[in-house]
UniProtKB/Swiss-Prot annotation:
It comes from the Eukaryota. It is found in: Mitochondrion. GO terms for biological process: mitochondrial translation; translation. Gene3D superfamilies: 3.30.190.20, 3.40.50.790. Belongs to the universal ribosomal protein uL1 family. The modification Phosphoserine is found at S85. This is Large ribosomal subunit protein uL1m. Keywords: Mitochondrion, Phosphoprotein, Ribonucleoprotein, Ribosomal protein, Transit peptide. GO terms for molecular function: RNA binding; structural constituent of ribosome. Pfam families: Ribosomal_L1. Its main location: mitochondrion. The keyword Transferase does not apply. The keyword Ribonucleoprotein applies.
Length: 336
């Protein structure tokens, strides 16, 4: 056992001497000065960086960078000058020509032509997209509205479901005889609150309006209002309007955009134009004419085509100009 321990000790001592000799031979390859400073090299680099003079920045360059403004993404787009003549072919670069503006009759003709060339449904819908100027002045705006109109030419054979609010038994009978889907008083209110009754439009007689307050939040813009002709005593007349009525409504998210279907593409062009004019006339009632054009842009499109920009000057109602004689008559009447 002692012999084995002595043998192991000799091996370890020999190995230690061999390692020390190898390290000494490697260290002798470098000068003494390098060997002494090699392990402190990072301190020398830090000292050199501290003593190095700071880079001088020209005053003009500094002012230039401070005056620079961020370039807008729109300015990065290369602008092209428009061509003087109209495109000679149907295929052309849009950026080289201003957007074309069409009369209503020409736009309808093109939509019918697109349908034939594209082999699409001839009975597809025709839509009118309006961008509105909702400003009233002095930080006031037009509230998003909903209206009901009777189009000159119907494009749908479906009859709207109409509910009539009245507590009078004879009026309930009249409503049912004239095509009302539902008619009643507080019992009808409860059914609507429980979602048992859902219809397209709601009309009411003035006497029952106080009992309809629970429905105000539920019906929202379809709640009966005098401005929408949904409150009155002539029940047959209201039903005649709302059974075939067309509803137009401003988009609640965009606040100034209105899109509505006005016809089908297989209808005669004059009927499509008449429906378009009826919608614009109704829209323009929601803002005084003396504030300028209410419709900023109008596009006509079909279900499968692009929108065609319309000339709106001839479509918008004009403010009535009063003559001097009419003004004098008005002032005289007011004084009397």
């Amino acid at each position: 056992m002692a012999a084995a321990v002595r043998c192991l000790r000799r091996v370890l001592i020999h190995h230690q001497r061999h390692c020390l000799c190898k390290m000494a031979s490697q260290a002798s390859l470098y000068p003494c000065s390098v060997n002494s400073l090699l392990h402190n090299r990072h301190f020398a680099a830090a000292a050199a960086a501290a003593t190095k003079p700071a880079r001088k920045i020209k005053k003009g360059a500094k002012e230039k960078t401070s005056d620079e403004k961020p370039v807008d993404d729109i300015e990065k787009i290369k602008s092209y000058t428009y061509m003087e003549s109209d495109p000679e072919d149907d295929v052309y670069l849009k950026r080289l020509y201003p957007r074309r503006i069409y009369e209503v009759e020409k736009a309808i003709h093109l939509l019918k032509k697109f349908q034939v060339l594209d082999f699409t449904n001839p009975k597809q819908g025709v839509y009118l997209d309006l961008t509105l100027d909702m400003a009233l002045g002095k930080k006031k705006t037009v509230e998003p509205f909903a209206s009901v109109i009777a189009l000159p030419h119907l494009f749908s054979s479906e009859v709207n479901k109409v509910a009539v609010f009245t507590a009078n038994a004879s009026e309930i009978k009249i409503a049912e005889e004239n095509g009302a889907a539902f008619a009643g008083g507080t019992d009808l209110v409860k059914k609507i609150m429980d979602d048992e009754v859902v219809v397209d439009f709601y009309v009411a007689v003035p006497e029952i309006m106080g009992e309809l307050n629970p429905l105000r939040k539920k019906l929202k813009k379809r709640f009966p209002k005098a401005t929408r002709n949904s409150i009155g005593r002539d029940i047959p007349k209201m039903l005649e309007l709302f059974k075939t009525a067309h509803e137009i409504m401003v988009d609640e998210e965009r606040q100034n955009f209105l899109s509505t279907k006005i016809a089908t593409l297989d209808m005669p062009s004059d009927q499509i134009a008449a429906n378009l004019q009826a919608v614009i006339n109704e829209v323009c009632k929601h803002r005084p004419l003396n504030l300028g054009p209410f419709v900023v842009r109008a596009f006509l499109r079909s279900s499968t085509s692009e929108g065609l920009l319309l000339k709106t000057d001839s479509l918008l109602p004009k403010e009535a100009k009063t003559t001097e004689a009419e003004t004098e008559e008005t002032q005289t009447a007011e004084a009397a």
